[in-house]
Amino acid sequence: MSFCIFNFVFRKFDCITFAFFFRVSEYNLVINDIDPQGNFGLNWSFEGQGAIPRYASFFADPLEFSASLILFFSTAIWFFIHSKLRETKFLSLFLVLVIVFSFFLSFSRASMFSAILTLVFGLYLSKNYKIILSSLFIVTVGFLYVYFFSSDDLRYLIQDTITFQNTSSLGHLIEWIEGLISIYENPFGVGLAMSGNASGVDQSIKIGGENQFLIYGVQMGVISMVIYFLILIKSIYNSSKLYLNSNNINHKSVGFITALTKFGLLIPLFTANAELYLFVAFFSWYLVGQSERLYNTKL
């Protein structure tokens, strides 16, 4: 998280980010044959509406950074809820605040909304129902304050996002429609490397790509898409059961963090090719494997 703060300071005072420092634009040009784009010479994901900069720390882009924050957020919630020492609770709360600050720096609306749902789900699993109501009240008041008393630019951004008039939101909608049409016409798929943002996909002929479920559906058909969705639901369910029924605090932590991480990644999966985010994808599936092992052998 310190990298994110360092990145923010770097940008404000020296007008550079880690992406500039490590010459990411040159890497994309030479290795991926992608020309620099946007007002910052990187790609369009590094800026929001009105050329507002978005930060990625040392990750490939802000979307991957924000998705990875879900994992850290889930871990911080675990320590905050289950720590018995006051010092540890304060440290966990500080970590939560740093992560929330990082969400704003990455400015991924899907991940920020997902973080709220992750918090509610974590409090529900741990049976902190009063805190859920308090949190929802605070979030609602905060949203209403931002919507009615913030700058016009931010208010218009919220309106355009909800009504799909924002360029990014409209792009998602178009990609979803393309994917759904392809699945309807080809229910058994059109083949691999035909959808998504992976380097092996020819962007000139790709179909859809802003929804992980539709990407699998376009490429491998409806059956594969449904199986992938059921695997996610089953992993969340089994991890939750592991947390609720285990008597070992270490096993409970694995179940809790796994359930929250996979639950929190559902929204990013609906808006991006999120399985390409290697760090959070590999680590979260590793946690699923550990959770399933404990669920089948220890309960």
Predicted feature descriptions by range:
Residues 4-7, 66-69, 218, 224-237:
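Transmembrane alpha-helices of multi-pass, membrane-embedded glycan-processing enzymes
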Residues 7-9, 99-102, 140-147, 262-271:
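Aromatic-anchored segments of alpha-helical transmembrane domains
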Residues 9-21, 106, 123-163, 180-184:
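A membrane-periplasm/extracellular boundary helix in multi-pass inner-membrane enzymes
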Residues 80-81, 86-92, 98-100, 116-124, ...:
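Hydrophobic transmembrane alpha-helices and their immediate junctions
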Residues 53, 149-220, 239-245:
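Long extracytoplasmic/lumenal interhelical loops at the membrane interface
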Residues 88-91, 110-112, 130-135, 228, ...:
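Short, aromatic-rich membrane-interface segments at the entry and exit
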Residues 74, 116-120, 258-299:
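Transmembrane alpha-helices of multi-pass inner-membrane enzymes
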Residues 1-29, 33-107, 112-125:
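Alpha-helical transmembrane segments of multi-pass inner-membrane proteins
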